Amino acid sequence: MTTGMRRALLCVCLASGLAGCAIDPTRLPPGATRAEALQRLGQPTATYPLPGGGERLQYSRAPAGFEVNDVDLDASGRVTVVRQVLDERWFPVDIQSDVWREADVLRNYGRPFEVTRVSSFDGVVWSWRYKLMNTPRFLYIYIDPQGVVRRWHTGDDLTTRYWW
């Protein structure tokens, strides 16, 4: 590879990296307007009303990705909080077993990576992929036939591990 080709490749890589940073939702400053959020981040994958007249813009990289970013706006349309919600620190704080319903799960985490059934539970298990220090993991939320969250847990994604 010639020096010119290496420089061109380096420029493309740097430009791609900077473009990726420009659309990182966590870089959106508090107080930004809804219009600014949409201009910087594009159309959200979902929107949800919040108490008090606010709105949640949800940017999910699922099913292939590992992040779901929630951008919360107040009633005046200004950003109050931006949070990457697929984070083990937040699961025990956010998930409310025996209280949350499907709509609460969707409003917080978006559409799941996968919906399955297991013989030990009468209902469905929704799962999301995320990373813990670059280790692929799953969040599993168990929803009963009435649409109520009954329990949740995390687990390693063993399909991506390499055992030598």
What spans do the regions from the language model cover?
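A cross-family detector of function-defining hotspots
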Residues: 26-78, 97-164
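Bacterial N-terminal signal peptides that target proteins for export
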Residues: 1-10
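Beta-turn initiation residues at beta-strand->coil junctions
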Residues: 83-84, 154
